[in-house]
Regions:
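Viral structural modules
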Residues: 1-238
Length: 238
C-alpha cells in the first residue's frame, strides 16, 4: 500500500481571535482546590459526611494563578469527582449541598439541615457523570482580594491566632456539605476531589508571578532569607 492510501489529508481552516488572550480564556482550566476523605473509621469524617469550606488557596497551582492579580471578581464552577481510594467506582449515592456563608452547616449525616428547602442540593451516584455546580460571586465587597493586611475578625486577637493574620473575610464563598445517602452507614471508603473553574472573570492590579514556596495558607509570605531560584542553570544549554 502506498502512503497516500493510508494517510488522508484534509483542508483545515483555522480561525483565531482575540478571545484566546482574555482573562476568561486564561482562567478557563479547572484546577484541584480541595479533597475530602470519607473513611469508614478514624478521627476525620468517619460518619459518612463532611463540610468543606470553599478555599482556593489550599493548592499552590491554583493559588499562584489567582495571585497574578490583587483583586478578582468571578463566578466559580465546581466539579466533584468521587471514587474509592483505589479508584474503583462503587454503587453509592451522594448528596452535595451548598451552604452560603453564615448559614448553619449539618452536624451529622442524619441532620435535618440536609432537608432544607433553601440550600440547593445535587444527588449523584458514583457511576454517573461527576456532579458539577456553579456558585456566583459571593463576596460582600466588590471583588475578592488575595492580598490583605489585617485580621479576619474584629476585637481582641490573641497570639495563638497569629496564623490567621492575612485571611480576608470578604473571600468567604460558602461551604459544600457532602454525605452518603441511606439509612445505614456506607460500607465503602470514599475520596472526593474538588475542581474549580473560573467564569466571567474580571481582575485588577496585576502582580509578579509567584516563584517561591508558600509558608502559610492565610498570607503570601515567603522565606526572604533563603530565596531559591526555581529555574535550572542555563549556562550549559547549547
Amino acid at each position: 500500500a502506498s502512503d497516500e492510501s493510508m494517510i488522508e489529508t484534509r483542508c483545515v481552516l483555522n480561525s483565531h481571535s482575540t478571545a484566546e488572550t482574555t482573562l476568561d480564556s486564561f482562567f478557563s482550566r479547572a484546577g484541584l482546590v480541595g479533597e475530602i476523605d470519607l473513611p469508614l473509621e478514624g478521627t476525620t469524617n468517619p460518619n459518612g459526611y463532611a463540610n468543606w469550606d470553599i478555599d482556593i488557596t489550599g493548592y499552590a497551582q491554583m493559588r499562584r494563578k489567582v495571585e497574578l492579580f490583587t483583586y478578582m471578581r468571578f463566578d466559580a464552577e465546581f466539579t466533584f469527582v468521587a471514587c474509592t481510594p483505589t479508584g474503583e467506582v462503587v454503587p453509592q449515592l451522594l448528596q452535595y449541598m451548598f451552604v452560603p456563608p453564615g448559614a448553619p452547616k449539618p452536624d451529622s449525616r442524619e441532620s435535618l439541615a440536609w432537608q432544607t428547602a433553601t440550600n440547593p442540593s445535587v444527588f449523584v451516584k458514583l457511576s454517573d457523570p461527576p456532579a458539577q455546580v456553579s456558585v456566583p460571586f459571593m463576596s460582600p465587597a466588590s471583588a475578592y482580594q488575595w492580598f490583605y493586611d489585617g485580621y479576619p475578625t474584629f476585637g481582641e486577637h490573641k497570639q495563638e491566632k497569629d496564623l490567621e493574620y492575612g485571611a480576608c473575610p470578604n473571600n468567604m464563598m460558602g461551604t459544600f456539605s457532602v454525605r452518603t445517602v441511606g439509612t445505614s452507614k456506607s460500607k465503602y471508603p470514599l475520596v472526593i476531589r474538588i475542581y474549580m473553574r473560573m467564569k466571567h472573570v474580571r481582575a485588577w492590579i496585576p502582580r509578579p508571578m509567584r516563584n517561591q514556596n508558600y509558608l502559610f495558607k492565610a498570607n503570601p509570605n515567603y522565606a526572604g532569607n533563603s530565596i531559591k531560584p526555581t529555574g535550572a542553570s542555563r549556562a550549559a544549554i547549547t
